[in-house]
Amino acid sequence: MQNLAPASEGQRLRRILDANLDRAREGLRVIEEWCRFGREDAALSAECKDLRQTLGRYHTEELRAARQTDQDPGTALSHPQERDRPTLNAVLTANFARVQEALRVIEEYGKLTDTELSETAKALRYRVYILEQALTLNPLQARLRQLQGAKLYLVTAPSDRLLEIVEAALKGGLPLVQYRDKTSDDHTRLTTARQLQALCQRYGALFLVNDRVDIALGANADGVHLGQMDIPMELARQILGRDRLVGRSTTNAQELERAIAEGADYVGVGPIFATPTKPGKAAVGFDYLQYARKHAPMPQFAIGGIDLSNIEEVIKAGATQVAVVRAIMAAADPEATTRELLRRLSQGEPS
């Protein structure tokens, strides 16, 4: 290898970004070919193409000019597993890992050179996780896995800025949205639900509809959330299909036992504090939260009056997953508030 003068730090960073943009785009192309020709799935193919093209916009001539393939000591390195791909699943798994690792590298090194690229890589990485689940798991398994990992859950409230607020929260990392609207006409609800579903899909978040199984079906939602006075869960599954999520609100041990017997995919636990979202409902406090933590086999989302001023109390009481309404819907900066709520929930995780 020819001895060259040491490259500047900026030059080295550009080489790292160039190499990993190449790696991510190549891996996505391999995955896209199977989505297109193997699965013949137009939606998954379009998602792969959008991911590739989004990365391509950041793969500038400046980054390409930093490339020094003949001086790269890594080009001669290989591993036996790279030469052995015995099954289709092995090919897909290897290329998903390749893309995810490359995006993480871009995210971290992009913080030093291009914060927009870094944030984009982070968002794309989560979309790739969803894509992998769609290809390697059945739809219900994929949704359940995503639900299990969702720390924060936004239940919407009517607002003239609804889409703007929800998108800001999604940019902040929100993994789960429930559309709740008790007053609008059905045409408005369906139109809004479809807009929210498209937003959630773009950011790789789950989307549920409150109460209305028909709206959930019409909007292609990931599932529905039922209250105690709504239709039986089995009927909801018959209408929606067995691959969708169904959650249930609970306020006491008897309601929790019913939800467990029905096979709820998750439960809401609350209201922890008094809240105008549920007027006339007495706060259940932390005793029921701790009971649910001990007895419920499915994810439990603490809900009711939770915000930045009291979330640490809720975490100390045992909650690991939290649902909020006003904390985000009424926030001056929904994106920053979402990030802070997620940060505190992450800090509260058991080590």
UniProtKB/Swiss-Prot annotation:
Keywords: Magnesium, Metal-binding, Thiamine biosynthesis, Transferase. Its cofactor is Mg(2+). Binds 1 Mg(2+) ion per subunit. 4-amino-2-methyl-5-(diphosphooxymethyl)pyrimidine binds at residues 178-182, 210, 249, 278. 2-[(2R,5Z)-2-carboxy-4-methylthiazol-5(2H)-ylidene]ethyl phosphate binds at residues 275-277, 305. It holds the Pfam family TMP-TENI. Its EC number is 2.5.1.3. It catalyses: 2-[(2R,5Z)-2-carboxy-4-methylthiazol-5(2H)-ylidene]ethyl phosphate + 4-amino-2-methyl-5-(diphosphooxymethyl)pyrimidine + 2 H(+) = thiamine phosphate + CO2 + diphosphate; 2-(2-carboxy-4-methylthiazol-5-yl)ethyl phosphate + 4-amino-2-methyl-5-(diphosphooxymethyl)pyrimidine + 2 H(+) = thiamine phosphate + CO2 + diphosphate; 4-methyl-5-(2-phosphooxyethyl)-thiazole + 4-amino-2-methyl-5-(diphosphooxymethyl)pyrimidine + H(+) = thiamine phosphate + diphosphate. Residues 64-84 are annotated as: Disordered. Residues 1-127 are annotated as: Unknown. Pathway: Cofactor biosynthesis; thiamine diphosphate biosynthesis; thiamine phosphate from 4-amino-2-methyl-5-diphosphomethylpyrimidine and 4-methyl-5-(2-phosphoethyl)-thiazole: step 1/1. It is an enzyme of class 2 (transferase). Residues 128-351 are annotated as: Thiamine-phosphate synthase. GO terms for molecular function: magnesium ion binding; thiamine-phosphate diphosphorylase activity. The keyword Transferase applies. GO terms for biological process: thiamine biosynthetic process; thiamine diphosphate biosynthetic process. SUPFAM superfamilies: Thiamin phosphate synthase (SSF51391). GO terms for cellular component: cytoplasm. HAMAP family: TMP_synthase, TMP_synthase_cyanobact. Belongs to the thiamine-phosphate synthase family. Condenses 4-methyl-5-(beta-hydroxyethyl)thiazole monophosphate (THZ-P) and 2-methyl-4-amino-5-hydroxymethyl pyrimidine pyrophosphate (HMP-PP) to form thiamine monophosphate (TMP). This is Thiamine-phosphate synthase. It comes from Thermosynechococcus vestitus (strain NIES-2133 / IAM M-273 / BP-1). The lineage of its organism: Bacteria, Bacillati, Cyanobacteriota, Cyanophyceae, Acaryochloridales. The gene is thiE.
